[in-house]
């Protein structure tokens, strides 16, 4: 076993970012540490020896996963073989439970300590998996405040480390962000965040643009801005944009925080982006569309009254949620219009968002993750 080598698996863009920050903090504690595994641009920049790139594995939903199963199984086998050959002291597995819990089972058999960062949402479904997790995970590091309590009595050693987004400073004013992006200061500005996966964009971006047409009919001066995830090429968005030549849509590579900060309102795909938008203290409408097979499976399994993270954390409806057929261009446009024209609705949402931000814990999540890893290293 190599005491100065760890395995890291981050199969999503957000996991890549959070894992990279944890690795940087770990090197402050153990300067000679080496890391290999699955990662994206952030982990590569942090010095990960990348055996498989995150970009090849990022998928969502049953229907989207099926075509990639051979590749996913190949990566799973490859990581098992690499771990057996290199014998790392610790594995840091980030999110992606369907992949990482399978890998964790094999790693435990090999004697590798498993630190799992970002708990699976078993509190929403699969509640019975907690005891199975206890058999394959040495430390569960939770980023939502209620998750540590959820694991009590299950045999899982869990700790709330705070949310990585709590690191962020309070946002600046709209004018500063618009200046940084080269956007006109006085125009109505709407951010469109359709997601970071090709399958999501194909399903969500076209109706978002249809909604944008309706918004423009009432606000002729409106400009739209889309932050393009670092794991995507702008060309993925072009087919949908080509059908809306009359819209003024600015594409920005990355810089999602600045795009949101520059906006009067945000139309955002459900996921971590909703929390990012909340931390920028901008009003939003949350939408999601998935393949119908995935949707019906989720309906059978999920036991939650909300699907937007902001509402889950608040325990009530703070932001509008539009799912499947409700995520129509008409509804999207109407909800955005309400945020633009109704000061009371806008203020009520922003007050709820402020409560959610306070619930995320103190800054320093990456440092606490690094301390947990260092604590199980030989």
Regions found by a protein language model. Name each.
Residues 1-378:
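Nucleotide-activated sugar donor-binding and catalytic core shared by glycosyltransferases
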